[in-house]
Amino acid sequence: MKSAWELALERSGGALQELSPEKKEKIAELERAAQAKIAAAKITAEHKLATMTDPDEIDQLKEGLVNEIRFIEESLARKKEAVRAE
């Protein structure tokens, strides 16, 4: 009986592609840059949040932060996939 991993491997067309050290480093750099952008967005939002009193504005700021983080993460995923496809 085959494991789920073996079945998935067969369906995907073979062995998983091993990444070269250069590609691994590119991906690591992309991840570091994305984490830095997320950290900067959080810090900026925290500073703005400290001066806000209107609950609606606070909700908008939090929603904007969530959207910005999602955009950064989606962009990271696309860039990582492009590196893997090279």
Question: Language-model segments: what does each one mean?
Answer:
Residues M1-E86:
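Soluble, non-transmembrane alpha-helical interaction regions
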